[in-house]
């Protein structure tokens, strides 16, 4: 592969409520046995990119623990491999990252010491499967300075006002780019995936940062007169930017067509856990549910996603909910439209009920 990778994994969001108090968005557990970053990291490896940097910032401990061994993504290599960059203070720098452009600039030695001609930049906070080598070839064929991957969401329920919105002219060349516009001119949203020449990226960063320009979209994409093209992606994609989007993403994988992302090659890799298979006792009734290994089910579970080592007691009902690792649902409980974080205990006969529009969130380690 003629490119190196950069995964931006430093984000946090108040819209995720208690779910982000103890972890970065990129470390969010999704779909029974994965973390959000597994998707972008697997995409890198599966696309032939063998040198990848993960740039972290907020609540990075669990993320660094998850990435402690690069071998699961075939990135334990003598040449290339997996790099994890965190903010650091020095005599020359006493700031945290002040924007995406700044986070890359503070690790510019990674770019300068590489020899590959291109860089693929993406977020570690979205769930999707993509072959970046196809985007790179498109970028080369267009002789583009920068290629942005986008998706047309006119046939979805996504609110375009939450994203960067773009319009394109002849040959799919970028005409306008607005971040979270009040009056959107199209339904083409940026997926935060970029391809750019390594030397050009270095030049743009070295011009921008000393002037106090730290934002990647505003200060790198829009402020410079460069040839930018769009690459349309029509596969499944969702980002974890709110409680509702987190719930939606997990529920989407109850659909077998979406689940093909996980069951068809190339596979999405993750840090494994050596647990026994899930156990379904005689009183269990499970319908349209993903159940993680090591779980024990005595009650009724419907339209839900259960992570590893979840216990559901006899007579309990779990419906339209996400139950994270090592949580305990007592006998006779009713859990509906809820997101239960890790290591939560719901005592016998308790009710935790939200709505489809506003799922209730129970933070990590709580006892109800």
Q: Model regions: which residues?
A:
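Unchanged
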Residues: 1-253, 358, 362-364
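Left-handed beta-helix
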Residues: 1-4, 199, 206-368
